[in-house]
Amino acid sequence: MGIKNLATLISEQVPNAIKSRDIKYFHGRKVAIDASMSLYQFLIAVRQQDGVQLAGEDGETTSHLMGMFYRTLRMIDHGIKPCYVFDGSPPELKKYELDKRKVRREDTEAKLKEATEQAEIIKHERRLVKVLPWHNEEAQKLLSLMGIPYVVAPAEAEAQCAELAKSGKVFAAASEDMDTLCYQTPVLLRHLTFSEARKLPIQEFDTDVIYNTLDLTQTQFIDLGIILGCDYCEGIKGVGPVNALKLIKEHGSLEAIVEKFENGDISSGRWKIPEGWQFKEARDLFMQPDVIPSEEVTLKWEEPKAEELIEFMVKEKGFNEDRIKSGIERLRKGLKVGVQKRLDSFFKIQPKTKEELATAAKKAKDAKKKAAAKGKIAKRR
């Protein structure tokens, strides 16, 4: 799930922290990708024309392998060096979110049994998609044969991605989960592994710009996310993104906010703090996540194991041999090039002051309002 409405809040309050990029922009960059999130996308999106998942002769799904193979090739073609990070065991506190997902799953299964229209059946089937251990195992085998590094995190994949980015092992963490920002990755990329056919630009979030423009510390930003609701606990019921930001800026911490609620200094019939709220434990998971220290992680991009790759993808999984061989050549070509020095690596970029960031944020907001106003006028015409 990530953090509810956080992307909307940043888009409205700090639009200058989000850049829309073409994939070519990231040539020469190393990126740590949330593999579990990517596999989930592939299982939903990579399908036949009738909406059914791809499968081999044995009837087992192969959508995850096709997505992993071709989306990785696309990145390699554009000079990006991807590494994938897989989820480990979820933290105990995540049981809250997992229980919610289980209830939603049971509800969807009941609706699927009652569905009669094909479109409705496919919609419910997609909602039931789940990344299973064997999907992860096959994806890891594929990556090994392709020569692409991967890491199995002790717990949350996005936390491990952020750890690699913070240390400079990679340029950015790539995930659809906005809670990646709470783990203090310098840069978050969204939509990196989306299909090219969707024509969605890659979103680049600059964490420092977000923190500085909102004038929040990392701890306060995490508290903001917890107010909105995260994977580890419920948020304050009835509080939307604008009021969540007001609360944290006015009171400074969740402890102070909870105290004000308990004393009756903050009162709203629509707002309610969850009973037995474990916000401190949730905050600790963001501040001190269970990760492998980056100095213990070695990332190596190697020559693909051509014969073994053909054996696995063609003979075992039924993929077209010519296409797999073509993919192997693309891998060889892309990985030989290496990570070239980018022009911006020769210059030290001075961080902007809070005043400069505030001015940039105001300009971006004004531009957004003007664009929205023009759109309304055009619709009237």
UniProtKB/Swiss-Prot annotation:
<feature type="binding site">
    <location>
        <position position="231"/>
    </location>
    <ligand>
        <name>DNA</name>
    </ligand>
</feature>
<keyword id="KW-0234">DNA repair</keyword>
<dbReference type="GO" id="GO:0005730">
    <property type="term" value="C:nucleolus"/>
</dbReference>
<feature type="binding site">
    <location>
        <position position="156"/>
    </location>
    <ligand>
        <name>Mg(2+) 1</name>
    </ligand>
</feature>
<feature type="binding site">
    <location>
        <position position="177"/>
    </location>
    <ligand>
        <name>Mg(2+) 2</name>
    </ligand>
</feature>
<comment type="function">
    <text>Structure-specific nuclease with 5'-flap endonuclease and 5'-3' exonuclease activities involved in DNA replication and repair. During DNA replication, cleaves the 5'-overhanging flap structure that is generated by displacement synthesis when DNA polymerase encounters the 5'-end of a downstream Okazaki fragment. It enters the flap from the 5'-end and then tracks to cleave the flap base, leaving a nick for ligation. Also involved in the long patch base excision repair (LP-BER) pathway, by cleaving within the apurinic/apyrimidinic (AP) site-terminated flap.</text>
</comment>
<keyword id="KW-0540">Nuclease</keyword>
<feature type="region of interest" description="I-domain">
    <location>
        <begin position="120"/>
        <end position="251"/>
    </location>
</feature>
<feature type="binding site">
    <location>
        <position position="87"/>
    </location>
    <ligand>
        <name>Mg(2+) 1</name>
    </ligand>
</feature>
<keyword id="KW-0378">Hydrolase</keyword>
<feature type="binding site">
    <location>
        <position position="158"/>
    </location>
    <ligand>
        <name>Mg(2+) 1</name>
    </ligand>
</feature>
<feature type="region of interest" description="Disordered">
    <location>
        <begin position="360"/>
        <end position="381"/>
    </location>
</feature>
<dbReference type="InterPro" id="IPR006086">
    <property type="entry name" value="XPG-I_dom"/>
</dbReference>
<dbReference type="GO" id="GO:0005654">
    <property type="term" value="C:nucleoplasm"/>
</dbReference>
<comment type="similarity">
    <text>Belongs to the XPG/RAD2 endonuclease family. FEN1 subfamily.</text>
</comment>
<keyword id="KW-0235">DNA replication</keyword>
<dbReference type="InterPro" id="IPR023426">
    <property type="entry name" value="Flap_endonuc"/>
</dbReference>
<keyword id="KW-0496">Mitochondrion</keyword>
<keyword id="KW-0479">Metal-binding</keyword>
<keyword id="KW-0597">Phosphoprotein</keyword>
<dbReference type="InterPro" id="IPR006085">
    <property type="entry name" value="XPG_DNA_repair_N"/>
</dbReference>
<dbReference type="Pfam" id="PF00752">
    <property type="entry name" value="XPG_N"/>
</dbReference>
<feature type="region of interest" description="N-domain">
    <location>
        <begin position="1"/>
        <end position="105"/>
    </location>
</feature>
<feature type="binding site">
    <location>
        <position position="47"/>
    </location>
    <ligand>
        <name>DNA</name>
    </ligand>
</feature>
<feature type="compositionally biased region" description="Basic residues">
    <location>
        <begin position="365"/>
        <end position="381"/>
    </location>
</feature>
<dbReference type="InterPro" id="IPR006084">
    <property type="entry name" value="XPG/Rad2"/>
</dbReference>
<protein>
    <recommendedName>
        <fullName>Flap endonuclease 1</fullName>
        <ecNumber>3.1.-.-</ecNumber>
    </recommendedName>
</protein>
<keyword id="KW-0255">Endonuclease</keyword>
<dbReference type="Pfam" id="PF00867">
    <property type="entry name" value="XPG_I"/>
</dbReference>
<feature type="binding site">
    <location>
        <position position="156"/>
    </location>
    <ligand>
        <name>DNA</name>
    </ligand>
</feature>
<keyword id="KW-0460">Magnesium</keyword>
<keyword id="KW-0269">Exonuclease</keyword>
<keyword id="KW-0539">Nucleus</keyword>
<dbReference type="GO" id="GO:0008409">
    <property type="term" value="F:5'-3' exonuclease activity"/>
</dbReference>
<dbReference type="GO" id="GO:0000287">
    <property type="term" value="F:magnesium ion binding"/>
</dbReference>
<feature type="binding site">
    <location>
        <position position="179"/>
    </location>
    <ligand>
        <name>Mg(2+) 2</name>
    </ligand>
</feature>
<dbReference type="InterPro" id="IPR008918">
    <property type="entry name" value="HhH2"/>
</dbReference>
<keyword id="KW-0227">DNA damage</keyword>
<comment type="subunit">
    <text>Interacts with PCNA. Three molecules of FEN1 bind to one PCNA trimer with each molecule binding to one PCNA monomer. PCNA stimulates the nuclease activity without altering cleavage specificity.</text>
</comment>
<feature type="binding site">
    <location>
        <position position="231"/>
    </location>
    <ligand>
        <name>Mg(2+) 2</name>
    </ligand>
</feature>
<feature type="binding site">
    <location>
        <position position="34"/>
    </location>
    <ligand>
        <name>Mg(2+) 1</name>
    </ligand>
</feature>
<dbReference type="GO" id="GO:0003677">
    <property type="term" value="F:DNA binding"/>
</dbReference>
